[in-house]
Design a protein with these regions (language model features):
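Basic nucleic-acid-binding alpha-helical/helix-turn surface characteristic of O6-alkylguanine DNA
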Residues: 1-104, 150, 154-160
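Short clusters of hydrophobic/aromatic residues that line enzyme substrate/ligand-binding pockets
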Residues: 63-67, 109, 134-137
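Gly/Ser/Thr-rich beta-alpha loop segments that engage phosphate groups in nucleotides
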Residues: 73, 90, 103, 112, ...
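Conserved SAM-binding loop
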Residues: 98, 120, 136
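Regulatory, non-catalytic segments
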Residues: 107-116
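Short Lys/Arg-enriched helix C-cap and helix-to-coil transition segments
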Residues: 120-127
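…primarily DNA-binding HTH/wHTH and HhH modules…
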Residues: 130-160
Length: 160
């Protein structure tokens, strides 16, 4: 198992993004307040750090690092569909469910979204309630709000 920490830009709700990988790709991304483990890097974590730096510098709006999330077949379908939500836009859970084949999938889509182990890279923050309200985000609604504002306003918060 490999671990790497990314220092987030000033004003971001958490000081670090913790990246976890195995030999096949990134398996986890979460937002943390402190460094809890000694870093042990590999090519996947280093590529992820590079892409996060580019994202926060306004040079990247999607990620190409190799991902290897653990989940059910349906969860993985949802997570890959999340990658189709354009940068700077939001979809409702219903829109995401329809894109997956049925509006009846809303609850299942919400559950899969909540279990996304690679937050930000798999952009589950771009999913909102049908009424436009921010709902559910494993990293916290403060982070979800920050990311949506950052993407909507043209990367005006560059690390610099």
């Amino acid at each position: 198992m490999y671990h790497h920490y990314f220092s987030t830009p000033k004003g971001f709700p958490r000081p670090f993004i913790h990246i976890t990988a195995d030999n096949n790709g990134i398996i986890g991304v979460d937002f943390v307040n402190q460094i809890n483990e000694k870093e042990r890097k590999n090519a996947h974590t280093e590529q992820c750090i590079k892409e996060l730096q580019e994202y926060f510098n306004g040079e990247r709006d999607n990620f190409s690092v190799i991902l290897n999330p653990s989940g059910t077949h349906f969860q993985k379908r949802v997570w890959w569909q999340l990658g189709e939500i354009p940068y700077g836009q939001c979809w409702s859970y219903k829109e995401l469910a329809i894109a997956l084949g049925s509006a009846n999938f809303c609850r299942a889509v919400g559950m899969a979204n909540s279990r996304n182990p690679i937050a930000l890279i798999i952009p589950c923050h771009r999913v909102i309630g049908h009424d436009g309200k921010l709902v559910g985000y494993s990293g916290g609604l403060d982070i979800k709000s920050w990311l949506l504002d950052y993407e909507k306003n043209g990367n005006s918060r560059k690390i610099g």
